[in-house]
């Protein structure tokens, strides 16, 4: 997801302290693994074992990108008389498309005596945008509220087991006392995407590493999340001393004074650039191409390369530009399975009065489905300022602030189109610009009995064929991109106008 030609992209990373930067639109950062629940398929540690081993902690860590400090983490875990309290503050300065922005994240909560989750609060602030999620566990339900402060939506998730939470996945792995070369799956809950995912953690060989002027014997653990690898080094007491992730991100335990020292904000590497993929040829006027063939390497089996305008065989991806039938022959009869994509959804509030009111200003009741779609795409293109932002994309907030990168553009477009009676989804992958392919997000909408791509950053219906779809769906589905970040290679074989 990028911005380019004036466009930007930004990715969201949600990370429990460095576990990983996953880039989705200039894509940028937002905390990926936040709350971890030891779930049904996890061999959980008994409450007695956990209580005996847990102690109060006050830890500071620096966050680095290729050796340059870009932020810090302050984590407090307090053992109280009858329960526990955790608090984690993250501060980062992130460079996307040459723009450095500050990101502040707070995660805190209370734990019951048996270490099960009682309540939590997650708050993210960056420039114009703010996101909050808070809630508690009631019997077999996680009940929580998400969105803009003052106008939050209630959500519930059924839990098959009583959830537990630890400061990080590695704390849980340490408490499980994994033997060397043994793996275990842990389930995590991400409050910004309403999803529960599985992470595989493996105990590696012990290593001696330098930390705070000392050489310390550590236990090494590596986590695999959807193909992306992150490693951590823990002390014999279980303190996380160091973490490394993709795109040159790492964290290391330091003193409070060291953590609070200044951050280098000049010359930071642009993650949008380093996560992009080189092209072997120059593509001129991509909007005029009818067909493109690209050899694709370094991908897994979780991606959505086949279907619609894309055909993938023997490592070669063929993308053919769609063509709408003449308006007179355009029948927008919507099948039942497609009608699912007319529904309002978290962050895509198509039934909200503000969204409906904006749609009524954009379209006319006499417009055809195609006319409605083109008017909405054009309105988003002209009225949403193209600027990289650090946020949890939310259609209502984008409509209010009228600024954002490709994620913000595409999520607002989904809400507007659905409100206008046009089924719509998000797609994510790569798009060509100035000799490289950048991560990007756009839309797909149902017109004339077929799914048609649309890009409100470029004002295109259909989107040009250099848009390479890797996933289709919301931010949960976009997590599948983590496994190919830094691995995918592209070779353009043919271009046909």
PLM segments and residue spans:
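Active-site rim recognition segments
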Residues: 252-265, 271-276, 333-335, 419-422, ...
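Active-site lining segments that contact anionic ligands and/or coordinate catalytic metals
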Residues: 218, 229, 237-240, 291, ...
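Solvent-exposed loop/turn segments at secondary-structure junctions
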Residues: 383-386, 406, 431-434, 451, ...
């Amino acid at each position: 997801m990028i911005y380019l030609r004036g466009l930007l992209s930004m990715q969201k990373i949600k990370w429990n302290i460095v576990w990983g930067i996953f880039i989705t639109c200039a894509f940028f950062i937002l905390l990926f693994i936040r709350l971890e629940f030891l779930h049904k398929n996890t061999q959980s540690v008994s409450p007695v074992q956990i209580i005996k081993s847990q102690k109060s902690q006050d830890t500071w860590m620096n966050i680095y990108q290729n050796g340059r400090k870009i932020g810090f983490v302050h984590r407090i875990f307090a053992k109280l008389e009858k329960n526990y309290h955790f608090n984690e503050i993250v501060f980062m300065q992130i460079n996307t498309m040459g723009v450095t922005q500050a990101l502040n994240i707070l995660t805190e909560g209370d734990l019951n005596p048996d270490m099960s989750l009682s309540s939590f609060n997650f708050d993210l602030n960056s420039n114009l945008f703010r996101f909050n999620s808070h809630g508690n566990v009631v019997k077999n339900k996680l009940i929580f509220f998400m969105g803009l402060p003052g106008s939050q939506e209630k959500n519930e998730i059924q839990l098959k087991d009583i959830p537990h939470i630890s400061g990080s996945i590695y704390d849980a792995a340490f408490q499980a006392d994994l033997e060397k070369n043994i793996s275990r799956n842990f389930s995590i809950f991400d409050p910004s995407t309403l999803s529960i995912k599985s992470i595989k953690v493996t105990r590696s060989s012990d290593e001696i590493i330098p930390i705070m002027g000392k050489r310390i014997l550590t236990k090494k653990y590596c986590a695999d999340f959807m193909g992306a690898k992150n490693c951590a080094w823990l002390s014999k007491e279980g303190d996380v001393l160091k973490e490394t992730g993709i795109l040159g991100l790492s964290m290391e335990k330091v003193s409070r004074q060291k953590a609070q020292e200044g951050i280098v904000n000049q010359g930071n590497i642009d993650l949008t650039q380093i996560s992009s993929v080189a092209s072997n040829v120059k593509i001129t006027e991509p909007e005029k191409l009818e067909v493109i063939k690209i050899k694709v390497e370094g991908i897994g089996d979780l991606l959505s390369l086949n279907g619609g305008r894309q055909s993938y065989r023997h490592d070669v991806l063929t993308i053919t530009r769609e063509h709408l039938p003449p308006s007179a022959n355009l029948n927008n009869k919507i099948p039942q399975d497609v009608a699912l994509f007319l529904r309002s959804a978290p962050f895509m509030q198509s039934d909200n009065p503000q969204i409906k009111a904006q749609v009524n200003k954009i379209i006319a009741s006499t417009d055809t489905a195609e006319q409605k779609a083109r008017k909405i795409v054009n309105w988003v293109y002209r009225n949403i300022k193209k600027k990289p932002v650090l946020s949890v994309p939310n259609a209502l907030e984008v409509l209010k602030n009228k600024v954002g990168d490709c994620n913000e553009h595409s999520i607002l477009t989904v809400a507007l189109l659905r409100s206008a009676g046009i089924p719509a989804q998000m797609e994510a992958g790569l798009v060509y610009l100035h000799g490289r392919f950048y991560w990007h997000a756009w839309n797909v909408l149902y017109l004339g009995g077929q799914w048609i791509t649309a890009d409100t950053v470029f004002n295109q219906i259909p989107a040009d064929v250099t848009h390479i779809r890797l996933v289709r769906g919301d931010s949960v589905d976009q997590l599948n991109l983590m496994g190919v970040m830094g691995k995918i290679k592209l070779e353009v074989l043919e271009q046909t106008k």
